[in-house]
Amino acid sequence: MLKSINHICFSVRNLNDSIHFYRDILLGKLLLTGKKTAYFELAGLWIALNEEKDIPRNEIHFSYTHIAFTIDDSEFKYWHQRLKDNNVNILEGRVRDIRDRQSIYFTDPDGHKLELHTGTLENRLNYYKEAKPHMTFYK
């Protein structure tokens, strides 16, 4: 039986740039650095960075694949401004109904998509039940 997510690992082209991003911008706690690796605790998760300089990264922006972190509604403006102030690549995101809460989509220095979201799974399911009758829901 799966218990939980153990860790998330990102391939990065420049370890120092990524350490700066995850520590100084996203406020992750740096736990370990090595020649080509760094570990963080971020939002209760183990985030691992492994430097791999020769990995193609040009098509990653076409995918909707991303990792979302929860933030409070009251912190939305703070985080949006923090990302802007640090010249983070903020993405336009999708058009969203306010019942689906607020999100900020952005990328790390290697183009990995991240999201800061103010909603919960329960919020999303309730919104979809109300607004999307074509969907099938299971218990």
Swiss-Prot record:
Official protein name in the record: Metallothiol transferase FosB
Cell location: Cytoplasm
Taxonomic classification: Bacteria, Bacillati, Bacillota, Bacilli, Bacillales
Residues where Mg(2+) binds: 7, 66, 115
GO molecular function, one term: magnesium ion binding
Record note on quaternary structure: Homodimer.
NCBIfam families (alphabetical): Fos_BSH, PRK04101.1
InterPro entries associated with the record: Fosfomycin_Res_Enzymes, Glyas_Bleomycin-R_OHBP_Dase, Glyas_Fos-R_dOase_dom, Metallothiol_Trafse_FosB, VOC
Gene: fosB
